[in-house]
Amino acid sequence: MPAKRLGFSGKSVSLLLTDDENEAMSIAKQLNEDNNERKEIEKNILMKIDEMVKANPHITNDRVLVIDGEGWHQGVIGIVAAKVKDFFGKPTVIISRDGEEAKGSGRSVEGFSLCDAVFACSDLLTHCGGHPMAAGLSLKSKNIELFRQRINEYALKQENMPFNACNIDCRLNPALISVQLVEPLAYLAPYGAGNPTPLVGLYKMTLSQITPLSQNKHLRLQFKRNNSTVSVMNFFTSQQEFPYKVGDVLDLAVTLDINEFNGQRNVSIILKEIKPSVLDTKDFLQSQRNYEDFKLGLNLTNAQITDLLPTREDFAILYVFLRKSGGYAYPIETLVHKLDYKLSIGKIRIILDAMSELSLIEMIE
């Protein structure tokens, strides 16, 4: 529980045990304040990490991300590690320095044992423990950089370093979505570690409408397939940040729940992941990995070189697009879709790097 991570577990227990309604309300209020404090601490650390990545974007090329800062609250670095891992799709260790001593917490992707990777560096650590998907550690602050090098050397020795996967529990025809279908999912709750919320795949959905909500903080997206229409909520994404347009055919990973309002019960569909239907995810991720290997100075195979090496025509395709568009404010990954899959993501990144070095464009990560 978040309360436990910040040392407030006693309040949580008291809330569950008390028979006094006033005391329960008071404790609940304190817990809510504590939780808001946790969120603010977490937000501040994530903002600092964002600044670090913008200043040194090359650090995200590592197979295992190791990011450290002075005085970060040790009660939330595990949560932060999970969020950074989800964003970059890589095993992540967040380390908080306290003078000469430091403590870290890590989260991994399925298929890469983080505890094995950490244990391989145990001579640098004063304490370590964990399991394949998460690990905790302590070390001297002076050893952080060496730990970063060593754990990445370990990762580079893995023959098939896994990608962060979005595991779909079932594919669903949108015509079948109903309150009666979704209701039984409640029996699977409570959700959490070891029992994640079921993810449903909706495939080849045509985007038909984009509606901003709450002063453009969120989006309601309408999709169609055959004769079926569904409304999907995309939280914390503005219309300017959403890279797709009406008419695009997309694959969605969503969660389903029941929303009750004014006596009416309806299915609530929440967007978790989205990609163009025609995008070959495996090829895309491999091309991204090829680019990272190149930036790390690793020996590349002929196939990797072919994937990355752009022609004069490739440069022209991307440059003309950027010039006509007046730049590009969306994630670089979505350029593959915007360029009609003429260029791989690895090739796009190589071209952007070259254009940036020649001062033809300015890149802001």
Regions found by a protein language model. Give the residues of each.
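Long, charged amphipathic helices and adjacent flexible linkers at domain junctions
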Residues: E21-V66, N152-L172, D280-T301
